[in-house]
Amino acid sequence: MVDELVLLLHALLMRHRALSIENSQLMEQLRLLVCERASLLRQVRPPSCPVPFPETFNGESSRLPEFIVQTASYMLVNENRFCNDAMKVAFLISLLTGEAEEWVVPYIEMDSPILGDYRAFLDEMKQCFGWDDDEDDDDEEEEDDY
């Protein structure tokens, strides 16, 4: 019984050693691929964006519709960069300043689920910074298209 356990332990140690070596080789290959990718990316010039980068939003209610249209348009033409709701919300947050930036801090501090839900985040912004219901109906069609 003890001999069998010793043999089993020896086999496990040999397997562990082989897997460790294989893991090291794979990590080295990954490192080389990451370096090659970085080198290739430096050689490629990204196409110019037909939509200008959105302006920041400081919480001024009258600018909210403009901000939402600008950001939605920018994300639409750069959809490969904004592949999920969390990326879209993070992009919006990166453009907040002043009162709007202060407003979002508690959501970030408590890791609110709203940070992963683009539609809910927009609704919360509209509620906080004011939104005319007539404009909401028109702009909602644009956002749904996105």
Swiss-Prot record:
Tissue expression pattern: Ubiquitously expressed with high levels in brain ant thyroid and low expression in placenta, liver and leukocytes. Expressed as well in six of the seven human breast cancer cell lines examined.
Could you tell me where this protein is found in the cell?
Nucleus
Q: Which Pfam families match?
A: DUF4939 (PF16297)
Entry keyword set: Nucleus
Q: Name one GO cellular component term.
A: nucleoplasm
Q: Is the Nucleus keyword given for this protein?
A: yes
Q: Could you tell me which InterPro entries the record lists for this protein?
A: DUF4939 (IPR032549)
Q: Which GO terms describe its biological process?
A: cellular response to lipopolysaccharide; cellular response to muramyl dipeptide; maternal placenta development; maternal process involved in parturition; negative regulation of cell population proliferation
Instruction: Explain the induction of this protein.
Output: Down-regulated by muramyl-dipeptide and lipopolysaccharide.
Function noted in UniProt? May have an important role in the development and/or progression of some cancers.
Which family does the record claim for this protein? Belongs to the LDOC1 family.
* Quaternary assembly: Interacts with NOD2.
Q: Specify the protein name.
A: Protein LDOC1
